[in-house]
């Protein structure tokens, strides 16, 4: 196989869509698998809709996903004169022409076709009227440059996913190459840039299939070899309809804020339309080793499954090193608190127990608040009701037990509290409920036998002793 060069070419007119992220991932993995190049091109020729904010967001999202590109970022706007020059070459060779038909005139033709229930393919009266068009151009009449599309025969796309796709050339219109303001259109710019960048394979959504037919016709007119085409089915919502905001988060930045890990999101997107045997968990490194376009599925759209996405994220959280998770959690909590070194150390120590119960980083950070010494505990309704029903004297005895332990570790705490529950003729769970409520403000938490040694005697006793204040304030929620 020749040296592979792929590209991802987003327009900075919005945030990176989850479908765009999958497209970028597939292009990246295919290039890396074949030891080729993966390039990033920002298609910023739509000045009215392109913004710096969106550009930065797209770049940041790709970096977060660890989809790293080769070479410098290519900006389409930097190549405008090259695009226009190619259009002028096509005019010179008789494969494009100056068109003076106004948008209003075209709209009238379109409305007439609709009235007559006919499909509308614009064929300009200037298509073969070269002498008159040159005369009008020289008189500064407004014009566009249109491609002289073939008007007979077929254009065939041999697509790696869609198979052979045949377009009747009569259905390909004379697309605009250069607008009346002198700027090139997307359809021209993308062909010129892909050629100049040496792109060998284009992997993108199958909503670009019609564009592909027009682009291949343009490649033929220019005498250039077209890249291999790989049009993948789009991502649909769980209900089988086109993905939209009503399905929930669709931007990569939203998933990052929700607490997804990039490794989990990439793993999930990888399996949307590509598979390797029955493997579900595929690391970044293994994906590079395995990925090829032969593994891309059929023509049916992939559906988002939020439950599976959440499951995968939970798996990756539990598989991630505690120190890495602690750093991420501390970063989240630092937006709310000025954390002391002691709190950071407690979060690090407690991470094993915390991560076993979390599927999102945001949940993990919320659960880690039990180790944030700079914040007062927030008690849920059920925890307060348990505390109100618990005799203060029982907790006073627990405080004495904790205070008298020579060594504070999981085993010593478990043994001491188990023996105490027996002397009180209580089930161990009955004793753990109020202790958990006082130490964590919740009815669910990591093992209390783990929480107590991590908090240490001073902080454990301080929280347990708070029972009197809670009961005297009658902090019961109904």
Curated annotation (Swiss-Prot):
Catalyses which reaction(s): tRNA(Glu) + L-glutamate + ATP = L-glutamyl-tRNA(Glu) + AMP + diphosphate
Family annotation (HAMAP family): Glu_tRNA_synth_type1
Entry protein name: Glutamate--tRNA ligase 1
Function: Catalyzes the attachment of glutamate to tRNA(Glu) in a two-step reaction: glutamate is first activated by ATP to form Glu-AMP and then transferred to the acceptor end of tRNA(Glu).
GO cellular component: cytosol
Protein source organism: Orientia tsutsugamushi (strain Boryong)
Residues the record lists as binding ATP: 245
Keyword terms of this UniProt record: Aminoacyl-tRNA synthetase, ATP-binding, Cytoplasm, Ligase, Nucleotide-binding, Protein biosynthesis
